[in-house]
Amino acid sequence: MVRLIGVDLPRNKRIAYALTYIHGIGITSARKIIELAEISPETRTDDLTTEQTIALRDQLESIDLNLEGDLRCFNGLNIKRLNEINCHRGKRHRNNLPVRGQRTRTNARSRRGSKKTVTGKKK
């Protein structure tokens, strides 16, 4: 099992898709990293040699991106700042409602939680 930046990569996936398990790396940046590390895109995670793993680790450290814990902390601080300045987006985050203008009269179930049933009117 390959471990990069504190993340265990899945065993039998192509390396480009395995790198997307690292928070902050999408498929496009994963392909660029693989290209810079001079690794074939068809290589599976199990088939990586130690030299290739070291090359991947070096590329991940050399790119100027926030990854994993740093990125999560950065996003958390941004949400905390929105809450502190009491703006509309901060209030939506605080109340666990959709932030980007989606409707809430119907839908938005994943953000608002499961349905709260109300008993019907008795006759």
Swiss-Prot record:
Question: What's this protein's family per the entry?
Answer: Belongs to the universal ribosomal protein uS13 family.
Q: Which domain of life is it from?
A: Eukaryota
Which terms under GO biological process does the entry name?
Answer: translation
Name a GO molecular-function annotation: rRNA binding
Q: Which organism is it from?
A: Trieres chinensis (Marine centric diatom)
Q: Where in the cell is it found?
A: Plastid, Chloroplast
Keywords of the record: Chloroplast, Plastid, Ribonucleoprotein, Ribosomal protein, RNA-binding, rRNA-binding
Q: How does it assemble?
A: Part of the 30S ribosomal subunit.
Instruction: Look up the record and report any one GO term of the cellular component aspect.
Output: mitochondrion
Region span, Disordered: 90-123
Q: Where is the composition biased (Basic residues)?
A: 102-123
Q: What does this protein do?
A: Located at the top of the head of the 30S subunit, it contacts several helices of the 16S rRNA.
Q: Which HAMAP family match?
A: Ribosomal_uS13
**Disulphide connectivity of cysteines:** none
Do the record's keywords include Cell membrane? no
Q: Which Pfam families match?
A: Ribosomal_S13 (PF00416)
Give the protein name, as stated in the record: Small ribosomal subunit protein uS13c
